[in-house]
Design a protein with these regions (language model features):
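Terminal presequence/propeptide segments associated with secretion/organelle targeting
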Residues: 2-5, 11, 19-312
């Protein structure tokens, strides 16, 4: 039996480590991982908290990117190669497909850099830093304010903070996220690159094998990947698409190992999660129990009944 620890940042990053024994879960932001590092070391983790998240040196946060607005990507070469899921690059693969060149059906591989395909509107964002800005966002709040007044204050203070955070430009993008039902606010500062080119993708029969049904319902046997490359200007800064751009030089990238893992190895996933509902209160859980679970049960009965009718 394996022991699973899960760190999830709402709108930010997620970790998962696997070890032996019982299940155990929790939620932590990468910037707060120092609070968990001793426990991780006891279970076989060999890196420091600074190796995971640091604003002073290259760390894992510099090799894990936000692909588009909802996917995770990983830098896997010193020349800006980026690995992400097949479904994350699906839209770009489709846009480049035609009757003559059906890349969704047949796959695509650029044999040279000149064959790599640009993708208008696609961005890749590197997290520069995250910080707790709760006192700044709630400055001016009083207990006698209405909820509408509180929302307006948060919006005003967030806009001012974001404007200040990105004033240096050069691809900076900032976002203020509310955590724990608005009891805590974090500023996330990203550096965003927009010259992202498709390098390779397997046929959908491999990359999307089993479709969404297998994705959500069953263990998967899928080559779920696509490969892109980030391009930058000659100074490694974000730049609009140009033939003069050069492959991005990452601060850190992952080395792919073909050795695999052994039973009980400490493993660890770091990425941008779509959503998290680990801190639901009882009032939020009740509709799930009374409606969603009941609906699934009724649906399963209907499916079983249809199966019997077909067999008869």
């Amino acid at each position: 039996m394996k022991k699973i620890f899960r760190w999830v940042a709402l709108g930010a990053m997620a970790f998962t480590s696997v070890f032996t024994a019982r299940a155990d879960e929790g939620m932590w932001l990468p910037s707060l991982i120092e609070n968990r590092i001793a426990d991780m070391h006891e279970k076989g983790f060999r890196l420091s908290a600074e190796d995971i998240y640091s604003i002073n040196q290259a760390s894992l946060k510099d090799a894990v990117v936000l692909f588009g607005r909802g996917c995770t990507g990983e830098l896997i070469s010193p020349e800006g190669l980026l690995l992400t899921n097949h479904h994350c690059g699906y839209g770009q693969i489709q846009q480049h497909s035609s009757v003559e060149h059906d890349y969704l059906r047949d796959g695509f591989w650029a044999m040279s850099r000149s064959e790599e395909l640009p993708n208008k509107g696609l961005t890749v964002s590197f997290l520069e830093r995250m910080e707790d800005v709760t006192p700044i966002i709630l400055k001016g709040y009083t207990s006698d304010m209405t909820e509408d007044e509180r929302v307006a204050l948060v919006k005003k203070n967030s806009a001012a903070l974001i404007e200040e955070a990105v004033k240096d430009g050069n691809g900076l993008r900032a976002k203020v996220e509310a955590l724990y039902y608005g009891n805590q606010y974090f500023l996330f500062l990203y550096r965003e690159y927009s010259d992202i080119r498709l390098v390779g993708a397997p046929p959908s029969s491999i990359g999307k094998f089993g479709g969404d049904t297998d994705n959500w319902m069953w263990p998967r046997h899928t080559g779920d990947f696509s490969i892109f490359r980030i391009y930058a200007d000659k100074d490694n800064n974000p730049a609009a698409y140009s033939l003069d751009n050069v492959p991005y030089k990452p601060k850190k990238y992952f080395h792919i190992s073909a050795k695999g893992v052994q039973e009980g190895d400490f493993t660890f996933i770091y990425g941008f999660n779509c959503m998290a509902v680990c801190n639901l209160n009882p009032l939020d859980i009740l509709p799930i129990i009374s409606q969603k679970i009941a609906f699934k049960y009724i649906s399963s009965i209907c499916l079983d009944t249809n199966g019997e009718e077909v067999s008869n």
